[in-house]
């Protein structure tokens, strides 16, 4: 008996030991919800991966719930896929045999806003205007305000919180990719690759992101790697009445396969013109190839290569006189007929491929790091007409308009009613005189053929060709359960070549490389008229140009950026705090590749000096050739974020930050086309920004309210235009521009509770964006070293100030300061119908500094009156506008393998064609008056929104 008991006890102990020796098994469960509405997502497919091996696949039930049991301890990847949502991946760790509750796993809907990118805006011809018309591209489909405003406000080129578009940080694969020269967003570099670039993460305002420190206007990181492209084969066809007739797109992605590889490809073509603007067209293509390799749980490598070769015709701004005469606010002066076919003089031609390689290292749940190297290269050209000793070929040149011949104001010295009648007849009967109201290409060719080979007119191509090398490394470390530390290092080496080349001789045989303005002023000094002085010194004659030859100017913009950042997030129950800092070093310089006769600089040695003297060349301090002084800046910034969660649905959070940023290359040189001269006393831009936010999110309800405030000081700006008073192409360099931006944002989407699946949605952006300083201005001209105005005050920049002290505030232009949208959204059974009404107000015309100097206000008699002050310095305010937009779409999910869908969007349903979306004051002055007492402005130029536009997109996914 005792033996039996001992044997039984031994067997029990052995069985227990065997059980204890086995790995504990646990699991993972949770609920899949719509990130925006918080509604449960039924039939979402969840695939669990261990490394690259697929373990199990389950679907969510009607309440969005799922359960995956019997998992050994370890690290897993959970891939969540559902119709009309972006694919999402999350990391899961199972410990000690427990079933891990993931609670709510949110999916981002594929909204119509994803069709909005930089190419959703017409290419405007405004290179020489000093006007910046770049809108803010709003992403963040998890944010109700951005999700609605990003689509509904795109027509009026809305800028979030009134901030300049270059303050919005855009990352690709963890690399900040804002343009090194201008700071502008780089969206055009991947336009047409919607599927490849669809997966992204966004933070708003001054929040700190996972990928970089960011600024005060949000951060968007586009993943761009193969594993984040939605699995399967997808094709789509789209037609768009505002941009192009046809877009064809196809994409294919394998997802992460059993062998750890993932491959993806995306191609597209955008072709044709549009319904509104003659001469504007697209002939653009795009390609994307990417591969990921998951070696194991710890190591992953990603590579991608893509580009968007193509060309598109540009639209030009015109004066209201021209629009009224033509009876069309969509008139475009950039085109004309050549042999009966439309030809645009202004065409953007680009192909700037990008390649990146990214390494991800994830040794544990508590630490991961990544490093990315990225290289951008290629060509970016922009054609325009150039001419020598010939009539200006632009049809809307002011000397071709009726107002040049007659004006009711007799002081304007325009009193020729006969010529006014002839001009008015031409412009009001444009169909009968197309050769006069548009570019007369046939006349240009005939003129060139009569010049014994030397072309009077050519088509030039202005190039901005970048070689841009970037490195970004970042890490995430969780030293304890309630703390997360992030940081990183960045480096950028950019060399951009600015030059122009002969694109078309237009029937001529050659063109001479001389400076037209210098030839007029220095005809007796031949070396001064040479664009390439070294060639003239060697051969004794100006260069003879053929197609493809560089001429006029040629220089490098050299930019170097290095930085580091660190952030720490600490959680204490419902309260969390994030502190972050950034330290950087930025430098840039100009490197001239062509010695210009007007600015030869100092000889490098005595022999050169003797050669120059023999030719009559006089050395100058200002040089067009060689390396300029180096401008360098140490920059720093700090941020604080506080976040308090109230219950399960509300949170209150605040952000505050102080930032110093180096000026950009394009705003630092007085005349980079001609010489190395930097603006005096350049300073970093200093910004203080703060916002306070309240957010409520529950199933069906999503609300965010934000109050924001910012001061942006010590900005600089350089603009170029022809100055009639100097009879030369002139440059106006401003420094010390301060502004204040404050306002309120509200976004909401709430159920009606009357009709199932019908919601009321709306946004409100109310701002006050004003100038708070009067900057100083330096004016130079391209054909002389003389400084026309040296660091003079612009006393009427921030406001119009009358003699009695009465002030009228001036506002930051480029965006409506009041924008509102209210509408209904219906979502049921994969149908969506949105109808919205928009209201925009408080938009202002972009100002030029010359009109706001004492010199311009005093006029020729050096006397200031209230009449002159108001006339010359007041800022134009645009009329408010109402718009109606409608969107409808449907998708069908077939056997959970195939998806067929369409979306149809109509913008500006009321066909309102009188909405000004922007414009600028010409930097020109009428001085040939009868009284010789005052100056008069030239008419400003405007951009208008087109009438009713539609976009139809049909797609099929395998």
Task: Describe every region a protein language model picked out.
Residues 27, 239-272, 276-315, 347, ...:
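Transmembrane beta-barrel wall of Gram-negative outer-membrane proteins
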Residues 298-358, 381-461, 524-549:
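Acidic/polar loop-and-plug regions of large Gram-negative outer-membrane beta-barrel proteins
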Residues 311-313, 317-322, 529-544, 587, ...:
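Surface-exposed extracellular loop regions of Gram-negative outer-membrane beta-barrel proteins
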Residues 458, 484-647, 672:
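Signature of Gram-negative outer-membrane beta-barrel scaffolds
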Residues 574, 707-713, 730-851, 955-957:
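Gram-negative outer-membrane beta-barrel transporters
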Residues 712, 760, 839-857, 890-958:
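C-terminal beta-signal and adjacent terminal beta-strands/loops
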């Amino acid at each position: 008996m005792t033996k039996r008991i001992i044997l039984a006890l031994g067997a029990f102990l052995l069985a227990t030991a065997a059980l204890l020796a086995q790995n504990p098994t646990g699991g993972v469960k949770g609920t899949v919800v719509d990130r925006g509405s918080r509604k449960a997502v039924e039939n979402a497919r969840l695939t669990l991966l261990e490394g690259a091996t697929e373990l199990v696949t389950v679907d969510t039930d009607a309440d969005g719930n799922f359960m995956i049991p019997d998992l050994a301890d370890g690290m897993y990847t959970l891939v969540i896929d559902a119709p009309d949502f972006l694919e999402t991946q999350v990391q899961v760790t199972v410990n000690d045999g427990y079933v891990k509750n993931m609670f709510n796993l949110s999916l981002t809907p594929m909204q119509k806003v994803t069709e909005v990118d930089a190419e959703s805006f017409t290419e405007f011809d405004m290179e020489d205007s000093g006007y910046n018309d770049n809108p803010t591209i709003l992403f963040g489909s998890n944010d109700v305000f951005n999700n609605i405003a990003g689509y509904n406000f795109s027509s009026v080129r809305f800028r979030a919180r009134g901030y300049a578009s270059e303050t919005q940080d855009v990352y690709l694969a963890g690399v900040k990719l804002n343009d090194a020269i201008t700071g502008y967003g780089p969206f055009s570099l991947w336009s047409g690759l919607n599927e490849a670039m669809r997966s992204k993460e966004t933070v708003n305002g001054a929040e700190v992101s996972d990928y970089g420190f960011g600024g005060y206007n949000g951060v968007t990181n586009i993943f761009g790697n193969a594993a984040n492209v939605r699995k399967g084969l997808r094709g789509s066809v789209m037609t768009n009445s505002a941009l192009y007739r046809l877009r064809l797109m196809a994409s294919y992605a394998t997802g992460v396969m059993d062998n750890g590889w993932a491959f993806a490809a995306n191609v597209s073509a955008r072709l044709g013109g549009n319904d509104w603007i003659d001469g504007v067209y697209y002939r653009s293509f795009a390609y994307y190839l990417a591969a990921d390799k998951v070696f194991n749980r710890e190591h992953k490598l990603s590579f991608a290569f893509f580009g968007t070769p193509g060309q598109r015709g540009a639209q030009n701004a015109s004066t209201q006189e021209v629009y009224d005469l033509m009876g069309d606010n969509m008139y475009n002066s950039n085109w004309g007929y050549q042999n009966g076919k439309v030809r645009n003089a202004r065409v953007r031609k680009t192909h700037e491929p990008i390649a990146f390689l990214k390494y991800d290292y994830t040794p544990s749940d508590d630490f991961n790091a990544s490093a990315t190297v990225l290289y951008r290269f290629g060509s970016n050209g922009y054609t325009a007409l150039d001419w020598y000793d010939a009539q200006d070929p632009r049809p809307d040149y002011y000397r071709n308009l009726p107002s040049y011949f007659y004006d009711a104001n007799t002081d304007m010295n325009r009193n020729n009613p006969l010529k006014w009648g002839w001009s008015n007849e031409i412009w009001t009967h444009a169909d009968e005189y197309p050769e006069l109201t548009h570019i007369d290409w046939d006349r240009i060719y005939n003129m060139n053929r009569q010049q014994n080979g030397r072309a009077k007119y050519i088509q030039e191509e202005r190039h901005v060709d970048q070689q841009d090398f970037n490195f970004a490394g970042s890490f995430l470390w969780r030293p304890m359960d309630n703390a997360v530390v992030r940081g990183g290092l960045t480096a950028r080496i950019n060399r951009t070549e600015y030059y122009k080349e002969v694109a078309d001789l237009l029937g001529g045989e050659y063109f001479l490389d001389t400076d037209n303005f210098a030839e007029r002023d220095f005809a007796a000094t031949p070396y001064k008229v040479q664009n390439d002085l070294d060639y003239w010194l060697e051969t004794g004659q100006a260069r003879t140009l053929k197609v493809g030859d560089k001429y006029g100017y040629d220089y490098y913009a050299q930019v170097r950026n290095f930085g580091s950042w660190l952030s720490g997030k600490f959680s204490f129950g419902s309260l969390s705090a994030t502190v972050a800092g950034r330290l950087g070093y930025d430098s840039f310089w100009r490197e001239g590749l062509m010695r210009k006769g007007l600015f030869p600089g100092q000889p490098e040695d005595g022999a050169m000096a003797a050669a120059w003297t023999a030719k009559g060349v006089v050395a100058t301090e200002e040089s067009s050739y060689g390396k300029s002084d180096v401008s360098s800046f140490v920059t720093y910034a700090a941020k604080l974020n506080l976040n308090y969660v109230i219950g399960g649905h509300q949170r209150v959070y605040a952000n505050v930050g102080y930032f110093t940023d180096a000026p950009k290359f394009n705003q630092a040189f007085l005349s980079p086309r001609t010489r190395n001269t930097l603006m005096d006393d350049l300073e970093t831009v200093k910004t203080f920004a703060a916002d306070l936010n309240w957010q409520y999110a529950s199933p069906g309800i999503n609300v965010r309210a934000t109050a924001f405030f910012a001061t942006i000081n010590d900005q600089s700006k350089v603009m170029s235009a022809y100055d009639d008073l100097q009879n030369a192409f002139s440059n106006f360099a401003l420094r010390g521009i301060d502004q204040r931006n404050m306002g309120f944002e509200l976004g909401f989407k709430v159920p009606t509770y009357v009709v199932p699946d019908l919601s009321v949605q709306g946004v409100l952006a109310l701002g006050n964006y004003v100038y708070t300083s009067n900057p100083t201005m330096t004016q130079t001209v391209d054909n002389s070293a003389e400084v026309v105005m040296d660091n003079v005050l612009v006393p009427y920049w921030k406001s119009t100030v009358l003699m009695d002290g009465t002030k009228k505030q001036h506002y930051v232009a480029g965006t409506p300061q009041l924008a509102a949208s209210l509408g209904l959204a219906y979502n049921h059974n994969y149908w969506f119908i949105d109808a919205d009404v928009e209201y925009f107000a408080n938009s202002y015309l972009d100002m030029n500094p010359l009109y706001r100097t004492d010199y311009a206000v005093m006029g020729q008699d050096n006397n200031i009156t209230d009449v002159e002050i108001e006339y010359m310095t007041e800022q134009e305010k645009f009329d408010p506008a109402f718009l109606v937009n409608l969107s409808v779409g449907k998708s069908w999910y077939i056997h959970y393998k195939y998806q067929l869908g369409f979306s149809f969007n109509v913008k500006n349903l009321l066909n309102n064609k009188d909405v000004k979306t922007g414009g600028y004051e010409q930097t020109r002055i009428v001085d040939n008056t009868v009284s010789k007492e005052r100056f008069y402005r030239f008419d400003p130029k405007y951009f208008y929104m087109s009438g009713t536009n539609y976009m139809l997109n049909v797609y099929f996914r395998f």
